[in-house]
């Protein structure tokens, strides 16, 4: 019987270039066992909440999958025997999560913002024009 799971695993930052190959290996393992991948997100290198093996950053990958217990056991076993995987977490879910995670949504929003130097230049240009009206008392954003 297939169930839905959310899987997050952390990869050693020195092994970040190996992550696409690892993802392909895990995808083939899941799909080879008649499983389904509903969502796959590569979050990239992120700050850890606490040091793991004297590391402060790790490469995060999120999977939402639908597999049976045998395939899940094989996947977890492959995490355990891969030295590059620092941590892994498997959580049983009620259904398939297919929409983008909050982390990826916030990453996309940050990606839409202009570069810092471009923002500063634009802010400087905007700051020169209304300089005469700075102290009129109507500007609540200045507080």
UniProtKB/Swiss-Prot annotation:
Query: Which Gene3D superfamilies does this UniProt record tie to the protein?
Result: 3.30.70.60
Highest taxon in the source lineage: Bacteria
Q: Which GO biological-process labels does this protein carry?
A: translation
**Bias regions of kind Basic and acidic residues — which residues?**
105-124
Task: State one molecular function term (GO).
Answer: structural constituent of ribosome
Keywords on record: Ribonucleoprotein, Ribosomal protein, RNA-binding, rRNA-binding
Alphabetical list of SUPFAM superfamilies matching this protein: Ribosomal protein S6 (SSF54995)
Family, according to the entry, reads as follows: Belongs to the bacterial ribosomal protein bS6 family.
Outline what the protein does.
Binds together with bS18 to 16S ribosomal RNA.
Q: Which HAMAP family does the record associate with it?
A: Ribosomal_bS6
Q: What is this protein called?
A: Small ribosomal subunit protein bS6
